[in-house]
Design a protein with these regions (language model features):
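A short core secondary-structure module
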Residues: 152-196
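A structural signal for short hydrophobic beta-strand segments in well-ordered beta-sheet cores
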Residues: 140-143
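Buried hydrophobic positions in well-ordered alpha/beta secondary-structure cores of metabolic enzymes
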Residues: 9, 20, 53, 60, ...
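A short, Trp-centered hydrophobic/proline-enriched beta-strand micro-motif
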Residues: 119-130
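A generic, well-ordered mixed alpha/beta core segment in the N-terminal half of proteins
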Residues: 103-117
Length: 199
């Protein structure tokens, strides 16, 4: 099935193609690789993307985003893919912000999504615990505490987890690993006591 873009989406596609062609050539990715960049992306380029509104491309306008939805994000990411543009966009928007948008409370949406759209907060999703994709295999637990939840466990392969300010953690609040029920999304601040990240 072919995706037919409307006029606004075509304008977005053209703008994204122009930006990526002129600002993020493949040589930028090679430079990041050769320099063993700690971030994994060029921060100045990400700031330019934020200025274009791309940090809020799929976030609804009511939460400070552009409201282009996932089609708009897909259009931008397709053009980023043409030049292998390195950015935290997939982890922050495609994974983290999507979890908050579809699973977060209204208060969480109002508090966090405008910060994401403004480029102030980077997000990640912590799902995997084994070398194989087993979303129901989560053994990480979240127990109610005085300040919300206490999360115990570890995650692997967290895309952009090393740069995220906040991580959406898939944790078990009931049941056993393998059970389809009892999984909860818990928002964890990277600066919280006990949180460690290795790369």
């Amino acid at each position: 099935m072919a995706l037919v873009l409307n006029e606004e989406q075509n304008m977005l596609k053209d703008a994204a193609k122009d930006f990526c062609t002129n600002n993020t050539p493949i040589t930028q990715l090679r430079r990041l690789r050769d320099e063993k960049s700690a971030l994994g992306f060029d921060d100045a380029t990400w700031r330019q993307m934020v200025d274009l509104g791309w940090a809020g491309i799929c976030i609804p306008e009511e939460f400070g985003g552009l409201g282009f939805g996932y089609t708009g994000m897909g259009v931008v990411l397709e053009e980023c893919g043409r030049t292998l543009t390195a950015s935290p966009m997939v982890a922050t928007l495609g994974l983290g912000a999507s979890c908050i948008l579809h699973g977060g409370s209204d208060d969480q949406k109002r508090a966090i999504l405008p910060q994401v759209a403004g480029g102030e907060v980077l997000l990640a999703l912590a799902l995997e615990e084994s070398p194989h994709h087993q979303p129901y295999g989560a053994a990480t637990t979240a127990e109610k505490s005085a300040n919300g939840y206490t999360v115990t466990g570890g995650k692997k392969f967290v895309l952009d987890g090393h740069v995220a300010n906040k991580v959406v953690v898939v944790a078990r609040t009931a049941g056993q690993p393998g059970d389809r029920d009892g999984l909860t999304l818990v928002l964890v601040d990277q600066s919280a006591a006990g949180v460690t990240t290795t790369r």
